[in-house]
Amino acid sequence: MRTTVRICGEENDMKLLEMNHVRKEFDTLKVLKDISLSVEEGEVVSIIGPSGSGKSTLLRCATMLETMDGGELLYIGEKAAWEVNGQTVYAPKAEKKRLASCFGLVFQNFNLFPHYTVMKNITEALIVVDKVPKKEACERAEKLLEQLGLADKKDAYPCQLSGGQQQRVSIARALARQPKILFFDEPTSALDPELTVEVLKVIKELARQHMTMIIVTHEMQFAKEVSDRIIFMEEGIIKEQGTPEELFGTDNERVREFIGHLSGYKAEEN
């Protein structure tokens, strides 16, 4: 478990994200069953569990890419979605857009525009959506590329980059909008082991800087080292959660079995 200056439960803790009694169905399949969770400012939460447990759907509901079928979603105490007479109601478009600026999302398959350079991939949303002046947008992008070891790639196209470099560009793009919370949906699942280490080092550094993050991952050792809290999901519910020490030392036979089956990434000691 990482060292953190934040202690959950203190009066000045800020809940950046709250999800209360969230439900989601696809046809007759209940994917999320009454899920409730909250994330404090500066907290790193990893979500683990078998495929089909609802982890990615939970992230997509949290980021409003999927419409919830029930429950409540709040960012910094402000409602983005709530339930009225059994139906989910979302905030008006302008309010929803403002609340969406609170978070950034890094996908497992990079989702870069292939016909844009690295620089344009990072700055396009800043300029077009956020109305940031082009000069400021470029300055933000250049600073992030420098921090992520990609300063010499700003004029390159995605096809000219390795998978690890593409994912670092995706992280830079998310960070450029200065979100309060970052979501990662299995950020290394499309990478080979060497490139996986490259990307996980970047996320570990963000954790050291107290960036609030929710990370869906199968990298057990990484989750143990980087997280304040680990959530185990299965069959659309949160079956167990706690500190890394609590999860990795649990008496819950199913959780022990799952963790034991995934040796995953062995984090480098720094």
Regions found by a protein language model. Name each.
Residues 182-185:
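Catalytic Walker B motif of ABC-type/P-loop ATPase nucleotide-binding domains
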Residues 235-236:
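Conserved ABC ATPase "signature" C-loop
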Residues 241-242:
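ABC ATPase "signature
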